[in-house]
Structures are given as structure tokens and as C-alpha cells.
Curated annotation (Swiss-Prot):
Keywords: 2Fe-2S, 4Fe-4S, Biotin biosynthesis, Iron, Iron-sulfur, Metal-binding, S-adenosyl-L-methionine, Transferase. This is Biotin synthase. [4Fe-4S] cluster binds at residues 66, 70, 73. InterPro entries: Aldolase_TIM, BATS_dom, Biotin_synth/BioAB, Biotin_synthase, Elp3/MiaA/NifB-like_rSAM, rSAM. HAMAP family: BioB (MF_01694). Pfam families: BATS, Radical_SAM. It catalyses: (4R,5S)-dethiobiotin + (sulfur carrier)-SH + 2 reduced [2Fe-2S]-[ferredoxin] + 2 S-adenosyl-L-methionine = (sulfur carrier)-H + biotin + 2 5'-deoxyadenosine + 2 L-methionine + 2 oxidized [2Fe-2S]-[ferredoxin]. One of its GO terms (biological process) is biotin biosynthetic process.
Length: 335
């Protein structure tokens, strides 16, 4: 335990993430030492990311009917899931962006359940980005699956600020989660995103049956990628999917994982996303915001309910954590 805390102190001092063996040791920290680990992760975040928590809202432009077989996902058309295919029109997307901005969020992410965007989806996204930019001062992100070079360039050109494409899990465990495409295909899309000039958002889901060794492997692989944002999800088992009967990650396990990712990526936005309500609850979320996490998705997720945004904003105020503003919002308020 002393070695783990000494390693964390080194990250605080130098801003260089832990090695994979060191990350693995973080996951063995006992419950009695967990508060000290979380405090160190929080201090690392404050030193290397600064104060404040970034708020984001997400909306699904195309829900369900996905041809891929991601075993955690109720939107796959291959599983006996209650989710059915549907599209959201432009006025509703603009309304969702306005509601997100009203919470103080800096990011609004347009998500589609697809392998990758076809011409119809790209037309819809172009129109949505144009309409939202005319109506709302908020950064627009997208999560549309696997991209071609031309698609990545077009998204950057129309003003997409950040692109999300999760690696989901360690490279060694990925074939147990998805069989219809490869980890390497996802990695390649992330390289296209960066080359096009967009910020890279890449994280994954914990609790899909991976080992602790593979969690540390995943954190080290994300550190190699060095994304601008890492969304950290916890499996919320969905009926009809292959992972429907997996157990939910415990609070202590989730907090150790959050601290590990912060110590792997001292300068990255580490955002709690899907599953935090069922895994952490209010008390666990509070501990995590004092344990390395500096981003939240507010409101509902793609197919599951989230927390009331007002409750998250009240929690941030209670903790004395300001909401981070984007350059776009700062410029708008200055004018």
C-alpha cells in the first residue's frame, strides 16, 4: 500500500501517469486506505486539470436497430431487447441542446446507434449541427461509430468540436465483448479524428466480466492514446443482452477504478457517464468528485434514465466545484 501511495504522490509531483503494473496495484488498495487514495487522485486532478467540473448532455439521433453485436448494448438489432429503431428530428435535437445548455453544460453530444454513418445520417448530422450552432452557444460533439477519412474531415469542417468513439475495454478482452468489428478498427477511427483536428473522446465500460489485470491494461492503453476526455461507464445490465445477468460493480470497486484512471491520465477530463446511478448512487458520486473525476453527463442517457440535472448541479455547489465554461461560452458572455 505504501508503494501505491508513493506512486500516486509521484504523479501529483510530476504529472506523469503510472505504468501498467502500478495501475494494477491501485486496484488492490484496501478499503481502509481508499480515502487516502481518493484524496491523492483529487489532488492530482486539481493540480493538472485545474478546478471545475465539465458538464455534458447527450441525445440519440438514431436509436436501436444497430447491426453490431456489442454484448452490453440494448440497441443492437441482434438481441431480444425492448429498444426499437427511431430517429429524432432537427427541432427536437435543437430543443435538447437548449435544455442541455440551460444546465450550464459546455458539451452537447449527438449519438447514433450505427456501425458507422451512412449518407442519410451524415445529412441529418450536418443539418443538426448547423441548426444547433445558430440557436445555442454550446460545443457540439458526435458519436457516430466507425468513420472514413472523408467523414472525419467533414465533421471537423462543419464544426464538430469533439468526437467520441469508445474502445470499451482492454484490447485483450474486446473479442469477448464485440465480434462484428475489431478493437483495431476503433483505434483507427480515433487516429482519423485526431488527424482531422477534433478533440478525442474515448473511454469504456467497467463490469463486463473483465479481470482487474485487464482494467489496468485498458487504462494503460488509454494513456497511450492520450484522449482529451475519458467517459467512464459502469455496466447497467440490459434485459435481452448477453450481459444481462452480470453483477453490478460495487461502490468501492468503482471508486478504486476512477482513481486508477486519474492516475493513468492526470490531465484528461475524466467523466462519469452511464451506470453511475446504479453503481455509485449519490454518496459514491460525491466521493468520486473528490477522487479524481472532473466531468459528468447530466440528464438521461441513451436508453436509461439518469439523475435530475438539478440534483447534480446542487451537488457541485455543495462541494464548491465550479462548472467549467467553454471558450465559446466565455466569448458569448463577454459580448
Amino acid at each position: 500500500m505504501t508503494d501505491v501511495l508513493a506512486s500516486a504522490e509521484r504523479v501529483l509531483r510530476d504529472g506523469i501517469g503510472l505504468t501498467e503494473p502500478e495501475l494494477r496495484a491501485v486496484l488492490d488498495v484496501d478499503d481502509d486506505s481508499l480515502p487516502r487514495l481518493l484524496d491523492l487522485a483529487h489532488r492530482v486532478r486539481r493540480r493538472w486539470c485545474g478546478p471545475g467540473v465539465e458538464i455534458e448532455g447527450i441525445v440519440s439521433v438514431k436509436t436501436g436497430g444497430c447491426p453490431e453485436d456489442c454484448h452490453f448494448c440494448s440497441q443492437s438489432g441482434r438481441f431480444d431487447s425492448p429498444v426499437r429503431s427511431a430517429w429524432l428530428d432537427i427541432p427536437n435535437l435543437v430543443t435538447a441542446a437548449e435544455q442541455t445548455a440551460a444546465t450550464g453544460a459546455t458539451e452537447f453530444c449527438i449519438v447514433a446507434a450505427v456501425r458507422g454513418p451512412d449518407d442519410r445520417l451524415m445529412r441529418q448530422v450536418r443539418a443538426a449541427v448547423r441548426a444547433i450552432r445558430e440557436a445555442v452557444d454550446i460545443n457540439i460533439s458526435c458519436s457516430l461509430g466507425i468513420l472514413t477519412p472523408d467523414q472525419a474531415a467533414e465533421l471537423a469542417e462543419i464544426g464538430v468540436h469533439r468526437y467520441n468513439h469508445n474502445l470499451e475495454t482492454a484490447r485483450s478482452y474486446f473479442p469477448s465483448v464485440v465480434t462484428t468489428h475489431t478493437w483495431e478498427e476503433r483505434w483507427q477511427t480515433l487516429q482519423l479524428v485526431r488527424a482531422a483536428g477534433m478533440e478525442v473522446c474515448c473511454g469504456g465500460i467497467l463490469g463486463m466480466g473483465e479481470s482487474l489485470d485487464q482494467r489496468a491494461e485498458f487504462a494503460a492503453q488509454l494513456a497511450d492514446l492520450d484522449p482529451d476526455e475519458v467517459p467512464l461507464n459502469f455496466l447497467d445490465p440490459r434485459p435481452g443482452t448477453p450481459f444481462a445477468d452480470l453483477p453490478v460493480v460495487s461502490v468501492a470497486e468503482a471508486l478504486r477504478a476512477a482513481a486508477m484512471f486519474r492516475l493513468a491520465l492526470p490531465r484528461t477530463i475524466l467523466r462519469f457517464a452511464g451506470g453511475r446511478e446504479i453503481t455509485l448512487g449519490d454518496a459514491g458520486t460525491r466521493d468520486a468528485l473528490r477522487g479524481g473525476v472532473n466531468g459528468l453527463i447530466v440528464g438521461n442517457y441513451l436508453t436509461t434514465l439518469g439523475r435530475d440535472p438539478a440534483a447534480d448541479l446542487a451537488l457541485l455547489a455543495e462541494l464548491g466545484e465550479p462548472i467549467r465554461r467553454s471558450e465559446l461560452q466565455a466569448l458569448s458572455q463577454a459580448l
